[in-house]
Amino acid sequence: SGINPGANVGRSVYHSGTIGACLTARNGGITGVAVSQAVDEGGYMGQGIEEMLRNQKWDSAAEIAALAVGEMCTNLPKEASVLNINVPNMDVSEMKGWAQTTVGTDLMRQMTEVDIEPKIGHEGAYHLNLKWGERITPSSIDNDVGAVANGYVSISWLSRLISQEPPSGSSVESRLDSIFTD
């Protein structure tokens, strides 16, 4: 899936359609590869818009994608998997290398302002405007955000969404018991 304009790193992994397509494939027993490329211009991280894409180095992302997908097809993993690849927006010759990464929690830009405006004609609905500040460059390349921000291709294998034990203090279960218990 991809090449997606805008890095799918950190928090954006959770709402990425590019990654969602690969997760869906894995649910059907098919290995998926999501490829995304950082967008350097504009005021926010994530999905780029038309005017932000004029200086994209698509050939670089395509070269990395072709190499990874070709190898994946030659040597498929034994079980259906999802590989998330994020490529910096630069020539391959300028990249520092690649890094095996975890999904980060850092942002690539600070959020400076959030405006909430009522949506005219839609009672109870609002339009949310996010304004992003200066670019942040995390020092660690151990996570996907830091790797891409520092000029490395990020390679992350994504796991399934799995359930967990209820968090301490959760009362949802006992509340549900109250309506289903005689």
Residue ranges: model-predicted function:
Residues 21-24:
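Acidic, metal/ion-coordinating pockets
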Residues 47, 64-68:
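Glycine- and Gly-Pro-enriched alpha-helical subdomains that act as flexible
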Residues 1-6:
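Short acidic, glycine-rich surface-loop motifs adjacent to enzyme active sites
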Residues 26-33, 70-78:
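Secondary-structure boundary elements
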Residues 7-16:
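Glycine/threonine-rich flexible loop motifs
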Residues 51-55, 73-182:
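C-terminal accessory domains and tails appended to enzymatic cores
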Residues 56-63:
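Active-site-proximal region of nucleotide-activated glycan assembly enzymes
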